[in-house]
Every structure is written in structure tokens, then in C-alpha cells.
């Protein structure tokens, strides 16, 4: 949650709903793949310049906080209601009818499609547009508890403070940062595959370990501690003619309208 997003979380009280699971961190450190430092940013400098905190958060905790605040603000949230189709054109009064997997229908004056890269709403408005990888870049995602890392003396200096670390290699990089009240060491491990990856894939863990065998021995040891992981595609959509329907009764926001491939 960069400072611009943190400002909005604070405005609506979502920061209080998430609580300690919004993690503050001290530094952003850039390294070569062998661990040699090449750049350093104290996060306080960024926060002071922008007047807002920079937080790290697991998406589960973010979603839970958003749901809690929405409910206390009077919103009705329906679960087990996966949308399968929508009709936004046939109503004479411009209303939108949504059908769900459970067979229910709901009618609205305005439908906001914030349903991600595989958006059902976007597909209804722009059926010919589909997410695709612009390159062979993709990422493993994994979590290792800080408590496990601290059992190894040679790794403790790397985790004695809460920091964001980046190891940069040729066609590969690793980003790590703390989440879950500073209890979990989250990793995004970028790499390339040919042909490009279109969907989340299960992987052989030895493949992941071999991918980073020449990296800094410290992060390599943490990589070897990963119990399981998946390969995630980094997808792009667009360009779209518009982010709304011709009648302006359906609008796309967020990743449903403009996903970007380089993200952690």
C-alpha cells in the first residue's frame, strides 16, 4: 500500500480494520543476484516527502478490512454469488441484470466491474478482448515464516529488521517483504518461460530451486525452505475502446480495465 493508497485506507478507516496486519517497514534494499548492495532507500524519506505511510499487506487482510468497513457502512455483501452473465442492453430504463452461478438474478442502476484480470464484466462488454502475457515474464509466489528463517544464524542479519529486499539477475529477480503483522516473509520470484504462461500453474519445487541456484546464498537458502509454490502469469489487457458501456450503465475499474504485467 503505497502512500497514495494509504491515504484512502485512512480516509475510510480501513487501516484500523486491518490493524497490525498493515506492516510498516524500514528500508528498500536493491542487490545484485549475488547479494552485493547497489541501492538503498529509507522508507521514512518517502513517507516524509509524501505525508503518508507506506504499508505492506497480504491481500487476504486487505480484503477482510475492506469487507468489514463496507458492512459497517451499510453495504450488503453477497457471497457464493459468482457472476456468470449480465444483461446491460435490453432494459428500456437502462438497468443492468446480473445472473449468478446459483441461479439468482440481481438488478442495478449501475454495475461496477471490479472483478480482476479475468473479468466477466469486461468480457460481456468487450467479448473479443482477452488477457494475454506480453512477454514470457511470470512469477512464483511463496511465503516462509520469519520464525523459520531466524532459526538459521547466517540468515538472521537479513531479517533482523523489517525491510523490502530485491535481488536482480538476468531475466530473473526476487522481491521479499514482510506481511501478516511481520510474521511472514513474502516472496515474488520473477523468471521467464517460453512459451509464455497464460494461467496459474502447479510446479515441481526442484524447478524453482534450480532457477535461483546461483543467487545470494542467503536468499537461496530461504528459497530452499519454500514448502510449495505456484507459477503466476503476468498478464496485459487492452487497449480498450472505453472503460464503460455505451449506455454508461456498466463501468470497469482497476485490474479489470487496465492490468499491468510488472507487479508484486
At which residue positions do the language-model features occur?
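Conserved N-terminal helical subregion
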Residues: 2-148, 192-208
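Residues in well-ordered beta-strands of folded domains
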Residues: 31, 99, 141-143, 167, ...
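Short, P/G- and charge-enriched loop/turn segments at secondary-structure junctions
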Residues: 51-53, 126-129, 160-164, 237-240
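A short catalytic or substrate-binding loop motif that flags glycine-/basic-rich loops and adjacent residues
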Residues: 92, 166-170
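Short glycine/serine/threonine-biased micro-segments
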Residues: 111-114, 134, 167, 252, ...
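Rossmann-like dinucleotide-binding core of oxidoreductases
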Residues: 136, 155-164
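Short, conserved charged micro-motifs
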Residues: 151
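FAD/FMN-dependent oxidoreductases across multiple families
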Residues: 158, 162, 170-174, 178-183, ...
Amino acid at each position: 500500500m503505497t502512500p497514495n493508497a494509504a491515504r484512502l485506507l485512512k480516509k475510510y478507516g480501513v487501516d484500523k480494520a486491518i490493524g497490525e496486519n498493515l506492516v510498516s517497514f524500514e528500508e528498500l534494499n536493491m542487490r545484485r543476484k549475488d547479494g552485493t548492495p547497489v541501492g538503498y532507500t529509507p522508507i521514512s524519506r518517502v513517507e516524509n516527502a509524501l505525508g503518508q505511510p507506506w504499508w505492506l499487506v497480504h491481500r487476504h487482510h486487505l480484503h477482510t478490512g475492506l469487507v468489514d468497513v463496507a458492512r459497517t457502512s451499510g453495504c450488503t455483501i453477497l457471497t457464493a454469488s459468482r457472476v456468470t452473465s449480465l444483461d446491460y442492453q435490453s432494459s428500456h430504463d437502462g438497468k443492468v441484470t446480473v445472473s449468478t452461478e446459483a441461479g439468482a438474478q440481481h438488478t442495478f442502476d449501475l454495475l461496477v466491474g471490479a472483478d480482476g484480470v479475468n473479468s466477466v464484466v469486461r468480457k460481456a462488454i468487450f467479448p473479443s478482448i482477452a488477457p494475454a502475457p506480453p512477454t514470457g515474464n511470470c512469477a512464483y509466489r511463496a511465503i516462509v515464516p520469519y520464525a523459520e528463517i531466524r532459526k538459521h544464524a547466517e540468515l538472521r542479519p537479513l531479517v533482523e529488521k523489517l525491510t523490502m529486499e530485491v535481488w536482480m539477475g538476468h531475466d530473473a529477480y526476487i522481491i521479499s517483504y514482510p506481511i501478516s503483522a511481520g510474521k511472514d516473509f513474502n516472496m515474488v520470484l520473477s523468471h521467464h518461460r517460453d512459451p509464455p504462461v497464460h494461467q496459474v500453474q502447479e510446479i515441481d519445487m526442484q524447478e524453482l530451486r534450480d532457477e535461483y541456484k546461483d543467487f545470494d546464498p542467503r536468499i537461496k537458502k530461504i528459497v530452499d525452505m519454500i514448502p510449495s509454490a505456484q507459477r503466476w502469469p503476468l498478464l496485459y489487457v487492452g487497449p480498450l475502446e472505453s472503460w464503460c458501456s455505451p449506455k454508461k450503465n456498466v463501468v470497469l475499474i482497476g485490474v479489470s480495465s487496465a492490468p499491468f504485467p510488472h507487479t508484486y
